[in-house]
Amino acid sequence: MIKYSIILLGSFLQAFSAISQASIIDMHIHSYEESHFENPATDYYGNKGSKNAAAHQKETFDAFAKYSIVKAVVSGSPKSVETWDSKDSNRVIRGIALNKPDDYGMDSVLFEQMVKDRKVDVFGEIGTYYSGTTLADSAWQPYLRICERYDIPVAVHTGGGDPGGTYSWAPKARLKFGDPYLLEDVLVNYPKLRIYIMHAGEDWYEHALRLMAYYPQLYTDIAVLLWVEPLDQRYAIEFLKAAKLAGYLNRVMFGTDQMRWPYGIGKSINFLNSLTFLTKKDKEDIFYNNAAAFLRLKK
């Protein structure tokens, strides 16, 4: 009888956990092509990344199911995003990852056609930091005009990048290009643009908060801050406390930025849930409600 009761209790706790953590929107997920896995990678904690593109997709979708992630903005090459969308088009919100305006042979004409063909739902992640540019540079303006015209949300990287990246794959990356203040001209020139910054400015989270104060249309995700390393988790705590104090939590959205490590999804969720200064309502808003409002999802 005791054993049976324990089994029932375990089942109840699992069910309660699933109910209490229902419906998450992840505003920052990455898809990759096979070539991205040619060089093995380990994270800050020494954990190896997924072995290949198929394993990475499966591990990420398994996490979606486990943690009730009902929608996810998937950013990657058009080819990889199409692969993910074909697996679960109801869950996947199609993004496109660009560090330079001409990545994948892209130009504004091709991009506008993709928008018309409903092959892109979010313009991002836009990694201007990695190419040593800013979203206010002239080369990006045709894309922004299209996004404003068709009401396509824009997601732009802020903060730094991977340690040593400037010495290898992103030689033009400089920390100064991660400052959210570099987006101010975009916010001024495109007042109707739906835009969210990624990583809440990271090192410059105070700048992110100040922009959110001046420009009430600006949202942010807190992706990568919740799991990748202790310094980023400190940024997450400080940013969220300040955003709560200022009354801006209603524009803060959950994101993972799992990169090659899908385990970061669960770790991010658990870390956010562990923050005792956030109420249950705060967490529900960050996990789902704020993103649903930003994305204008139908109820």
Locate each region found by the language model.
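Active-site gating/metal-coordination segments in enzymes
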Residues: 79-165, 172-174
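Histidine-centered catalytic micro-motifs
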Residues: 24-34, 155-159, 197
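Catalytic pocket-lining loop regions of alpha/beta-barrel enzymes
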Residues: 121-122, 136-253
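Active-site environment of divalent metal-dependent phosphoester hydrolases
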Residues: 32-34, 79-82, 101, 130-131, ...
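Active-site neighborhood of phospho(di)ester-bond hydrolases with catalytic His/Asp-centered motifs
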Residues: 25-27, 74-75, 95, 124, ...
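Bacterial N-terminal signal peptides
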Residues: 5-15
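Mid-to-C-terminal alpha-helical segments outside catalytic/metal-binding sites
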Residues: 2-4, 21-30, 36, 43-67, ...
